[in-house]
């Protein structure tokens, strides 16, 4: 029997943040229409990738339950003190069996179902290291969405070095590498919940 094919893209759900603007609750476990936000995202992200990872620094057992239908693996930051999404990215890069990692926050229930395919096409066409989503509104205003990205896992050592140096800004680290921006016209697809008010607004959209 031939060996199973190696996965080409890992999906990484970023659920390891503090959620300071939501009283420190675990955002991915908050309910939208009776379903945890993280599960909404997993249902959209997992079909687009070959393996699924969940970056969670709290409630690992609960995330394991949510991720079980997708054979998701639960990972935690290598660095302490909740240093931000870059730490989750690093953990995902280290854990991935695939050479590419597609990431998404855990609180974006309307994630585009063609996100990964479009990021991959741009990454390959431009021979880039990173492909990042950018929304464009009706007034042609561009808004980068740095936590919706496709990255080469070969960048892990550089990212680890920058984190060790105290860098925490996602876009500043992206700027060190060839990054291609991929336009998305549906702003709704990237709506998230950074506050209780925004979570309530998601339910009305």
UniProtKB/Swiss-Prot annotation:
Keywords: Cytoplasm, GTP-binding, Magnesium, Metal-binding, Molybdenum cofactor biosynthesis, Nucleotide-binding, Transferase. It catalyses: Mo-molybdopterin + GTP + H(+) = Mo-molybdopterin guanine dinucleotide + diphosphate. Belongs to the MobA family. Its EC number is 2.7.7.77. It is an enzyme of class 2 (transferase). Its main location: cytoplasm. Its cofactor is Mg(2+). Mg(2+) binds at residue 107. One of its GO terms (molecular function) is GTP binding. InterPro entries: MobA-like_NTP_Trfase, Molybde_CF_guanTrfase, Nucleotide-diphossugar_trans. One of its GO terms (cellular component) is cytoplasm. GO terms for biological process: bis(molybdopterin guanine dinucleotide)molybdenum biosynthetic process. GTP binds at residues 14-16, 27, 77, 107. Transfers a GMP moiety from GTP to Mo-molybdopterin (Mo-MPT) cofactor (Moco or molybdenum cofactor) to form Mo-molybdopterin guanine dinucleotide (Mo-MGD) cofactor. The N-terminal domain determines nucleotide recognition and specific binding, while the C-terminal domain determines the specific binding to the target protein. CDD domains: MobA. Pfam families: NTP_transf_3. This is Molybdenum cofactor guanylyltransferase. It comes from Burkholderia orbicola (strain MC0-3).
């Amino acid at each position: 029997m031939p060996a199973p094919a190696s996965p080409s893209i890992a999906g990484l759900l970023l659920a390891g943040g503090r959620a300071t603007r939501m009283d420190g609750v675990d955002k991915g476990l908050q309910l939208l229409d009776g379903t945890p936000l993280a599960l909404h995202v997993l249902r959209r992200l997992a079909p687009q990738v070959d393996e699924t990872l969940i970056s969670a620094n709290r409630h690992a057992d609960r995330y394991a339950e949510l991720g079980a239908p997708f054979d998701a693996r639960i990972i935690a930051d290598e660095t302490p003190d909740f240093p931000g999404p870059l730490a989750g990215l690093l953990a995902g890069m280290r854990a991935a069996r695939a050479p590419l990692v597609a990431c998404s926050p855990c609180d974006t229930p309307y994630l585009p179902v063609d996100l990964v395919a479009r990021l991959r096409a741009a990454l390959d066409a431009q021979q880039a290291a990173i492909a990042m989503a950018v929304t464009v509104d009706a007034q042609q205003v561009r808004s980068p969405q740095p936590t919706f990205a496709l990255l080469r896992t070969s960048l892990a050592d550089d990212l680890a070095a920058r984190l060790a140096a105290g860098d925490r800004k996602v876009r500043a680290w992206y700027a060190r590498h060839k990054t291609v921006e991929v336009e998305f016209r549906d702003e709704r697809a990237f709506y998230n919940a950074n506050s209780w008010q925004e979570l309530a607004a998601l339910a009305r959209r």
